[in-house]
Amino acid sequence: MTKPSSKASRKPVTKSGRNSKRSRSGSSKGDAQVARAINNQKPGLHPRNLHRDGYDFDKLTKVSPVLTPYVQPNPYGNLSIDFADPQAVKALNAAILKLDYQIDNWDIPEGFLCPPIPGRVDYLHYIYDLLAGVEEFENKSETEMEGQNVPPVNSHTIKPKKMKIKALDIGTGANAIYPLLGIQTYGWRFVASDVDPISLANVKAIVEGNNCLLGKLEVRLQNDHQKVFSGIIKPDDRFDITLCNPPFHASLKEASEGSQRKLKNLAENRASKGHKLEPKAPKDKSQLNFGGQKAELWCEGGEKQFLHNMICESKVFATQCLWFTSLVSKKENLEACYTELKRVGAITVKTIDMAQGNKLTRVLAWSFLTPSQRGLWAKYRS
């Protein structure tokens, strides 16, 4: 197994003084108005991330007037929303999906997770680079390929080449955010799995409401809550990549405490920026933006156990998937993952750090195929 390289974990580099097309206008007055509507660039986001310059609320409210009541100036004069308000966050997501990803009909039932789009699409950009790296180095020898990292940030292509990619999203939730963004950003095809039939019914409704998604997203129900890939990957399936955002917590109590902690941090952050601190207790847990259904938030053993199970099962499907990947929120869980990956015989392991504002997370990627086998997979991809 190739030892995880620190180079693969390099943090994204942000360019200072980057001029945004959104901030250009024909007059100084127009410049001031547009600048006021756009938040500061989000540090650490991938160079191809459309949201590096924040949110253009003027455009967002124009395409989705439902967002308008939630948008207010903050103490710095920038337009923003209350990110502790789940309805505001849902309205923002719907507007972003419509403006930037041409998805017109998107909704989720009350009480389901409403993920922030900038961080979610970052995952897709980085795994695109992982897949592009396979093709870029497919003609190199295994010795040359050993330890090969994801291309550094400053070499990421501005206009990525088209690749016929089939991806598997484990635990897609009711929002199906990864398939939606992957289809509209890169033209990938997806299979999306979940243990919750309500979530999958909602995903089907989203697909049926958007012609651009038809025929590109298939949903599969996981009937065994103890399994990850088994029962989902069929004998004739071949996936270029698998994605997963594992349940973070080990119990409902831990999940509830985490939600309350995040809500408190948001309130304190708003207070530090000049907002009047008016803590409000939600009527129920489902009203927290950090709420969610059991399968979305927690599982027995938490993230560490989920990753262990995923790695163990991945060996069974070693030749059916080019790359397996997962987000890893807790850095301390990586060492156990590396140990298990060595035990099951993974040939290459990569860890890709992602920075989103003050939040650090990482993508763990592994493959059971040799570099030359991965090169052939890319070359003969259907």
From Swiss-Prot:
Listed Basic and acidic residues bias regions: 269-286
Stored Pfam families: Methyltransf_10
Region (Disordered): 1-53, 269-288
Annotated catalysed reactions: adenosine(1618) in 23S rRNA + S-adenosyl-L-methionine = N(6)-methyladenosine(1618) in 23S rRNA + S-adenosyl-L-homocysteine + H(+)
Basic residues bias: start-end ranges: 8-24
Class of this enzyme: transferase
GO molecular function: 23S rRNA (adenine(1618)-N(6))-methyltransferase activity
GO cellular component, one term: cytoplasm
Compartments where located: Cytoplasm
SUPFAM superfamilies: S-adenosyl-L-methionine-dependent methyltransferases (SSF53335)
Major localisation: cytoplasm
Coiled coil region boundaries: none
Domain of life: Bacteria
GO BP: rRNA base methylation
InterPro entries xref list: METTL16/RlmF, rRNA_lsu_MeTfrase_F, SAM-dependent_MTases_sf
Keywords per UniProt: Cytoplasm, Methyltransferase, rRNA processing, S-adenosyl-L-methionine, Transferase
Family per similarity comment: Belongs to the methyltransferase superfamily. METTL16/RlmF family.
PANTHER family in the record: RNA N6-ADENOSINE-METHYLTRANSFERASE METTL16, SAM-DEPENDENT METHYLTRANSFERASE
Protein name, entry field: Ribosomal RNA large subunit methyltransferase F
Species lineage: Bacteria, Pseudomonadati, Pseudomonadota, Gammaproteobacteria, Alteromonadales
